[in-house]
């Protein structure tokens, strides 16, 4: 069989919810608000496909640079480069 080149390839464990997290995500997570300059963690919610950043960025921390519609534009360091990642608030968690 040919190798898959899809967006979610090699994510069997990365995009898996634990038993206690299964089911519908809370609405509070969708209406979070982040200020520009705030640090956020990218934690992908696999049950919500819209606005999902690339799985490569799962677990990374970035800085909010701006908004694009309902989504946030984040600046995430990737080795020596800085990448812009667009993600909906459902996939973001504020850094404490």
Curated annotation (Swiss-Prot):
GO cellular component: ribonucleoprotein complex; ribosome
Gene3D superfamilies (UniProt xref): Ribosomal protein L21 (2.30.30.70)
Record has Ribonucleoprotein as a keyword: yes
InterPro entries listed in its UniProt record: Ribosomal_eL21, Ribosomal_eL21_arc, Ribosomal_eL21_CS, Ribosomal_eL21_sf, Translation_prot_SH3-like_sf
Keywords noted in UniProt: Ribonucleoprotein, Ribosomal protein
GO BP annotations, alphabetical order: translation
Any GO MF annotation of the entry: structural constituent of ribosome
Pfam annotation, one family: Ribosomal_L21e
Domain of life: Archaea
Listed NCBIfam families: PRK04306.1 (NF003303)
PANTHER family from the UniProt entry: 60S RIBOSOMAL PROTEIN L21 (PTHR20981)
Family: Belongs to the eukaryotic ribosomal protein eL21 family.
UniProt name for this protein: Large ribosomal subunit protein eL21
Gene transcribed to yield this protein: rpl21e
């Amino acid at each position: 069989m040919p190798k898959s080149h899809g967006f979610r390839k090699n994510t069997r464990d990365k995009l898996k919810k634990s038993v206690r997290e299964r089911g519908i995500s809370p609405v509070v997570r969708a209406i979070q608000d982040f200020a520009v300059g705030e640090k956020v963690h990218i934690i992908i919610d696999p049950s919500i496909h819209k606005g999902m950043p690339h799985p490569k960025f799962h677990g990374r921390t970035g800085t909010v640079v701006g908004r694009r519609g309902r989504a946030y534009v984040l600046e995430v360091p990737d080795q020596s480069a800085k990448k812009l990642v667009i993600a909906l608030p459902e996939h973001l968690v504020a850094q404490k």
